[in-house]
Amino acid sequence: GVVVGGGLLGLEAANALKSLGLQAHVVEFAPRLMPVQLDDQGGALLRQKIEDLGVQVHTEKATTAIVPGSDARLRMNFADDSHLETDLIVFSAGIRPQDTLARACGLEVGERGGIVVNNQCTTSDPNIHAIGECALWNNRIFGLVAPGYTMARTLSAALNKDTGAAFTGADMSTKLKLLGVDVGSIGDAHGQTPGARNIRFHDEQAGQDMHQTQHA
């Protein structure tokens, strides 16, 4: 089986296929696994760990077509003229905000989708609110459940006349849940915040790598 998407859910899905006795592959468009949470060094180490589990990893692969295969049910054609045949494809390639109703109602939506909300999770119509993965806050869509919970608490407080209620962001820490592979990511993993400094701790013998970003 092939999982399209090398993020958290994609890797967990690939591990599930492997545990069922299937030959598992991960196909990722980016040059590394978990591209949002990890840098190049962390991604390389994770790839090694994942392949040690028996899951084959294919990065920098853009799927151009899925057609009937010759040795398997399906054939995935990639932009680099390579291909991969499989009987099963699982897509775990990110989220897309469900904002069709909001568009139909004339609410403000983002250029790439998502219902625009303010710090009180209120849309462009003061009588309509949005939370979770459909909400676009500060030009950002959150693809994790934790921010949705935080938004829900904020909105509940605001509806109960708490004038101090405000959504100011959420805990974006993530942890990969695979047997024998421990990966955690918190904060600004890529050090893109102005004034950030990267500090790296690497234990080659133990196969452990940790990056810490500090801000001036």
Predicted regions span which residues?
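FAD-site-proximal beta/loop scaffold in flavoenzymes
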Residues: A72-N77, S82-A157
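Mid-to-C-terminal Rossmann-like scaffold of FAD/NAD(P)H-dependent oxidoreductases
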Residues: C134-A216
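Beta1/beta-strand and adjacent pyrophosphate-binding region of the FAD-binding site
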Residues: G1-G7
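Feature captures the FAD/FMN-dependent oxidoreductase FAD-binding
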Residues: A65-A72
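Rossmann-like dinucleotide-binding cores of NAD(P)H-dependent redox enzymes
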Residues: L8-A65, G148, F167-D182
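Conserved beta-strand termini and adjacent loop/short-helix elements that scaffold enzyme active sites
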Residues: L8, E60-A62, R112, N118, ...
